[in-house]
Amino acid sequence: MTTHKTLRTLLLCAIYSFVLLFFLSSDSYLRDIFGHFDSAIFFMCGKAWMNGLTPYVDFSDSKGPLLWLIYGLGYLLNHHSYVGVFWISILFYTATLFIAYKLCRLFLEPRPAALCVAILPLALFYYEIHCEVVSEDFSYVFIMLALYCLTRILRDRDLPANTWRRLSVVMGVCFSACLLIKWNVAGMIGSLMLVAFILSFQPKRWAVCLGGMVAGAAVMALPFVLYFLLFADFGTFIQEYFINTYRTMDGKESAFVVLTWGRLMFIKERLAIIVFLGLLVFCYKRWRYAWLIFCFFIFRIGMGLAYSSKHYYMNLMPFFLFFLIAVVGYIYSKWPRWMNRLTPALCILVAIGVIYYNSKSINGHFRGSEQDREDFYTAAYIMSQVEQPRLMWYNMEAGMGTPVDALPACRYWTRQIGASEEMLKEREKMLAGGKADFVIVSRHLHEDEVVEEVTARVEAQGYVPYLEVRAFANEPKFILFGRPGWQFPPEDFHVSQWDVWLKRNIFGI
């Protein structure tokens, strides 16, 4: 593509990304800041890092430092909401859609390629698996880029050495980027790299391929390695991010999660089957691309066979693009004249349909529950009386301290799924040491914890209950505990829908 066409394509991808995320992202201006869970944890980690706390020492979770850096930059853009992350997400999705277009152009003319890209978000934002912004949203671009590189190699294995080197370096960068976001996704991308390496033997490019992959991976990882060696604790980083994260899926709590999500897992598995069948359609009469089927199965295995949360299936969605290439390409070959004329209108109609269909996952998109909002901001008002309050959660973080610059009280301030006994004991030790200004107890704890027992332990350390925060159809969800003496908001305290949409700084912090 010429520079002019490239810039025009990037601009269209950016506009489409903005529109998609404005209506479908939980971080959008249309959404309030309550109702976040995974993204609330990531935001807390990024915020803690930007405030001088040491990753994996002062705070920890099962995700990588690149994801926390993304959320830390989002925090710097806006301290008290997720709209900073929203704008960063637009950049990531712009790149994802642009790379998807480039991949389509390997097989299709510009107009059918554009229609494929317009349809693709139907899968990327599929409402049954995409309920909030998660780490997979930021992995999409690297998966798509690695798929593009492998497809180039599958299409023409006799590429010049410089092209082999360039594609290999990019795949290495993608590997390390995903390793630093969520390490099991790096294993999935490793399957694409393995196929590329195997194919490099035929044109005798294996040394160029291997060297490029190693160089790309090293360049991406080096800044983080140096940071942890010089300014943090590299050993603790390895222990927490790789070893402890692996161990969290080995225990009775994992069985509890499997039973809890079993029905959803069965429902979501049909998505994997649909994407697989679509890949078969693409590979029909294109058997040189059958290696993609092998990679698809490695991706599915990498998600976990015993337990796969619904958003894990997002990792498979980039493969759906190959089905679109096959079907859209066939339709354009049959009716080229009419389809080329209708492409702009079809792209607009498809975009509207994608947003309408996938908005099912966004509950209370334009107007959230008034009662939920009142409870959420009442809790935030109480916490705002402490400068940068330190929080501890019994169960998963839910973003209640986001509007008041709250920070983690300890390394395991929120409970990871499958938390080990050592993690739980350290949290109890921190509770006894009075590290937290506020403790939030969920009424939906894991099977090894009873609400009454947990609240008794919290109260024994001098904390008193302030209020129950309702969420999800006005059900009591969280109990806020704090030290005695904090004030409730005055009667005229109110957070309006306009405050939410304009992302006003409610507490003037």
Residue ranges and their predicted role:
Residues 187, 305-339:
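Hydrophobic/aromatic-rich transmembrane helices and adjacent perimembrane loops
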Residues 128-139:
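Short acidic/glycine- and proline-prone juxtamembrane loop motifs at membrane-interface regions
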Residues 267-300:
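Hydrophobic, aromatic-rich transmembrane alpha-helices
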Residues 100-123, 140-141, 159, 166:
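Transmembrane-helix signature of polytopic, membrane-embedded enzymes
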Residues 163-183, 189-194, 218-219, 296-304:
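Membrane-interface alpha helices of multi-pass inner-membrane proteins
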Residues 190, 194, 364-448, 472-473:
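Short periplasmic/luminal acceptor-recognition loop of GT-C membrane glycosyltransferases, typified by
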Residues 87-108, 145, 149:
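Transmembrane-helix motifs of polytopic, lipid-linked glycan transferases
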Residues 144-170, 204, 277-289, 328:
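Membrane-interface transmembrane helices that cradle and orient dolichyl/undecaprenyl
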